[in-house]
Amino acid sequence: MTASRVLVLNSGSSSVKYQLLDMRDSSRLAVGLVERIGEQLSRLKHTPLAAGGESREWTGPIADHDAALKAVAAELAKDGLGLDSPELAAIGHRVVHGGKHFTEPTVVDGAVLAEIERLIPVAPLHNPANLTGIRTAQALRPDLPQVAVFDTAFHTTMPESAARYAIDVETADRHRIRRYGFHGTSHAYVSRATAKLLGKAPQDVNVIVLHLGNGASASAVRGGRCVDTSMGLTPLEGLVMGTRSGDMDPAVIFHLARVGDMSIAEIDTLLNKKSGLIGLCGDNDMREIRRRIDEGDERAQLAFDIYIHRLKKYIGAYYAVLGRVDAIAFTAGVGENAAPVREAAMAGLDQLGLAVDAELNAVRGDEPRLISPAGARVAVAVVPTDEELEIATQTYALVGSTDMRPRREGND
């Protein structure tokens, strides 16, 4: 296949993030963001990287995703990278929820679109926007393969003992209630990159991946396959996050409805947008929380302590699930940049072979690196995630194969 470029689109409800990559060397040719779609002051920022060009910004009304992608196409064309280029092999789309139906990236057809739409009830904030992005791209280049890469796909290897909730089986099956997990594209990339850092093949490494951003999740990866993950039916379960509560007693919801006279919508907003770090101390930026701690702020300290306590519980649980752990990998905004979080998460875990070297932990960088002491039984690493490269890699691998039929398994 002579065409070697892949355009990666991450379509949100009011934004489109994009990158154009050349898969011959995985280099980025252009990156950009369209935000506040549907508003009078929409904003597009485009940076051509191939020619070392300067960023261009534009502000004005962008009515919908169709207008947004047309604006992106126009910016790319200015740099000789237009969507009509014969060098463009495919467009890869991030799709948040594929249920257990999609276990691999798949070329989009009518049946695939219908299945993504069928999953909207379990991903109401994300799948509609992802669908809009795909359909808009199809309209712009109907002859070009559109590939869906699912956040949930990496987690479909979990055993039923990890994926099932302990509720009535018929009810769970009827409403597709199970642990799906999210951030899978990041967990897949980081687990492989960690194995490479250790000089081993992915199938020979057991790793606990900690994706710590405003949204946060952990996964237990045995030999390159996910066996457990912290997020569940939705991204609300698991770790303490920027604005999400993570794990809690489900009866809190009933209590708030009965005693607090709150509606389901109000409780949903509380747990997803007004909880986690921001609910505990009013901030969801770890840098600001650390600054407040340094000034003696007790609420910030408590929020940090709760965050770390939950993180340690998952590290211990996944250590038990895996049996043997070769590495702990920190990734995403907080995981990559917040040395105090990494230090606190590993503190007191010497009996598990876990520790960080203070000097190595303080070093900042863009490359995967070890922060554990020399000779440590378990490697502790900082591994910057690259979800766009992972989507492009999976997309290119699929369209470069001879079999481009949609890849699905069974029905939910």
Language-model regions, residue ranges each:
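Glycine-rich phosphate-binding loop of actin/hexokinase-like ATP-binding domains
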Residues: 154-259
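Short beta-strand-loop/turn "lid" adjacent to the catalytic site in phosphate-handling enzymes
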Residues: 76-126, 145-147, 153-164
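Internal helix-turn-beta structural module
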Residues: 301, 305-326, 335-409
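Catalytic phosphate/nucleotide-handling subdomain of diverse soluble enzymes
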Residues: 221-263, 269, 332-363, 369, ...
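Glycine-rich beta-strand-to-loop/alpha-helix junction loops that act as flexible
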Residues: 11-12, 93-97, 212-214, 329-337
